[in-house]
Amino acid sequence: AASDVYKRQVMAFPNTYFSNLNNKGAFNNLSSVKEEVLKMFDPSFDPYATPTEGEASVPDRFGAKDVEDLTWKSLMDAYTCTECGRCTSACPASQTGKLLSPRKIIMDTRDRLEEVGANKRNNGPDFKDNKSLLGDYISEEEIWACTSCNACVQECPVSIDPLSIIIDLRRYLVMEESKVPSELAGMLTNIENNGAPGQFAQADRNNWVDE
């Protein structure tokens, strides 16, 4: 409806104001995970000490499975999109025939958000419909087709960020469901064992100089 388009155009102003000004390609980290890693390398840290007030706690869920797990900015993005399609036109995955469409990611997020809101209004705040954004609206194939190139973010005239939603959905799959494409499983194993994506131990990294 025309009124919906006007509402989204009005939302463009606050959405642009609150857009991320950091260099594109710099992903945000999970504070709870970062704090745990820092503690591991701190010889003075007492693992049995009582947590201090204000200390980062373990989140209920890593990443996002449904719209309630997304940030408020991602939800604002969903309500701001006017469906112009510039993001999908610039997406290399979409251009090469992959299932991914950044425009659809945003539209699916908005549709799911409206569905959740309607369910809560009609059935109470604790109502669960046993559906989720990941799986019922956005497939695993879609989010793993993304190359994280930020072309969609760069092209959006109102600073919508579909990539943040994709990254949060991926984080859920990896950290909560342990679902990783086979192409990435080897890389993650190498990082765990060698501290780098390559299949070389840290002591052997400079061997190529002598060859």
Model-based region annotation:
Residues 69-78, 113, 117-211:
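Iron-sulfur-cluster electron-transfer modules
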Residues 30-99, 200-203:
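Non-transmembrane accessory domains of multi-pass membrane transporters/channels
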Residues 101-103:
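Juxtamembrane segments of multi-pass membrane proteins
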